[in-house]
Design a protein with these regions (language model features):
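Intrinsically disordered, charged low-complexity linkers and terminal tails
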Residues: 1-163
């Protein structure tokens, strides 16, 4: 293994930022600001998650999943394009909660999990926000996330019939 001095040396040489509990909030908002949307999944997922998060940073996966599905089903019900052509979501698939849950956990959830912002407990059926991140969040931060996700959805769907 590397000594702490070696880690710092290589981190400096390679330009690798340190990621820890003191940087997690900035890391999270930097990640959101990247606006990396090959498909729309991150936006309705994050909105569903923050709409269902409780006072300790947990959200029941079934509630998140129901709201996530509702977003796409609403688009179908209104005769709007669900997403880009590569998106597998259609009327039939949206009725298969198990398939949608598997897809949601693979993408977009996994993108948040890989960076340690969110965790999933299959046994508890809970998606949790990293507690260091959750403890630093303010009302303004939640509003900022909601506003950005709604704006990003409007921009994303601007050429697909709107949100």
């Amino acid at each position: 293994m590397f000594s702490p001095d070696d880690v710092k040396k290589y981190r400096d040489e390679l330009g690798i930022k340190e990621h820890n509990d003191s940087t997690i909030k900035k890391d999270f908002f930097d990640f959101l600001e990247e606006r990396d949307y090959s498909l729309s999944y991150k936006m309705p997922f994050m909105l569903a998650f923050i709409n269902n998060i409780n006072t300790i940073g947990d959200a029941e996966i079934d509630k998140v999943l129901d709201e996530y599905i509702k977003f796409y089903q609403d688009r179908i019900d209104r005769g709007l394009q669900v997403d880009r052509r590569t998106c597998p979501y259609n009327e039939k698939m949206l009725k298969d909660k198990k398939a949608i849950c598997k897809n949601m956990l693979a993408n977009p959830f996994e993108k948040f999990e890989r960076k340690r912002f969110l965790y999933y407990s299959k046994d508890l059926s809970i998606i949790s926000m990293n507690h260091a991140l959750f403890s630093q969040m303010t009302k303004e931060d939640w509003k900022r996330i909601r506003t950005q996700m709604q704006e990003d959805l409007r921009n994303y769907y601007s050429e697909m019939g709107g949100v």
